[in-house]
Regions:
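Short, intrinsically disordered or compositionally biased N-terminal tails of bacterial proteins
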Residues: 1-31
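Basic amphipathic alpha-helical segments that dock to polyanions
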Residues: 81-91
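Basic, amphipathic "hinge/linker" alpha-helix immediately C-terminal to the N-terminal HTH DNA-binding motif
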Residues: 48, 100-124
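N-terminal helix-turn-helix DNA-binding core of bacterial DNA-binding proteins
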Residues: 38-77
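Acidic, aliphatic-rich amphipathic alpha-helical segments
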Residues: 113-184, 233-255
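Non-DNA-binding regulatory cores of transcription-related proteins
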Residues: 179-181, 188-196
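C-terminal interaction segments
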Residues: 193-255
């Protein structure tokens, strides 16, 4: 964002102060606020409610229907999910859209403003990879596509900006794909809408072992833990050259 844009937003925020001194932002009025002009505090006014960032997390993987969001976040409940979606719409972080035929269903998707949260949330997810797992966490909630979402932004310097391809993964019951576009590796839920360059199958443990560098792609193929359903055998190594977790890698920052 330009310096002028930042100045305009700052002026808009200060011009919209309530009588009690609580800022009411022109691009979405939080129901709760820390009441501070600190940019981090103002960000938390919009994103700090429980479940909000997890809703955004799902939309980083592509547009989602209400029932899909409820299925992957069952503890949120339909009423609270509706509230969170409404708040994110008011903040212009998400919008409603209708998928083209033959689907022709209503979905929620990120706006350009919402897409700007990709790198900050990926950085937060990478930080979380090193945290100990609380005993109260249900291991059945583990999903390969969420790990892939966090890792996809860490090694983009290894990507050729001129390449354009799609790799589809079948990990247990999960199906997701990566779109390599303009030097970015973007994970998306569901099968690829076009014929993928490669299609790969493995179980969740194998995917995690590959991502955490506890298993090499060649060994996974040799042991039968991973299968190339379509495309070249080298595609598995290419994917995990980018996805493999490197705790020393700098956090993702993109223009």
């Amino acid at each position: 964002m330009s310096t002028l844009g930042i100045r305009i937003r700052w002026r808009a925020a200060t011009d919209c102060m309530a009588i009690d001194g609580i800022p009411r932002y022109a691009w979405g009025v939080p129901t709760k606020t820390y009441g501070q002009m600190c940019p981090l505090a103002r960000s938390l006014d919009v994103l700090g409610e429980r479940w909000t960032m997890l809703v955004i997390r799902e939309l980083l993987l592509g547009p989602k229907r209400f029932k899909h969001l409820l299925a992957v976040l069952p503890a949120i409940g339909s009423n609270r999910l509706s509230e969170r979606l409404r708040g994110l719409e008011q903040a212009q972080i998400i919008r409603k859209n209708t998928l083209p035929p033959p689907a022709a269903v209503a979905v929620y998707e990120l706006t350009e403003e919402g897409e700007r949260l990709r790198d900050p949330l990926i950085a937060l997810g990478l930080w979380g990879l090193d945290l100990p797992v609380d005993d109260r966490i249900d291991p059945q909630t583990a999903r390969a596509e969420l790990v892939a979402l966090c890792l996809a932004g860490t090694q983009t310097k290894l990507l050729d900006p001129g390449r354009g391809e799609t790799v589809e993964f079948h990990v247990g019951d999960e199906v997701f794909h990566f779109q390599l576009r303009h030097g970015r590796f973007l994970p998306r839920s569901g099968p690829s809408p076009t014929d993928p360059t490669a299609r790969i199958a493995c179980d969740l443990q194998t995917f995690m072992d590959l991502a955490l560098r506890e298993l090499t792609p060649s060994q996974a193929l040799k042991d039968g833990r991973a299968t190339i359903l379509a495309g070249s055998r080298s595609s598995l190594a290419e994917v995990f050259r980018v996805l493999a977790y490197n705790p020393q890698a700098p956090l993702p920052v993109h223009a």
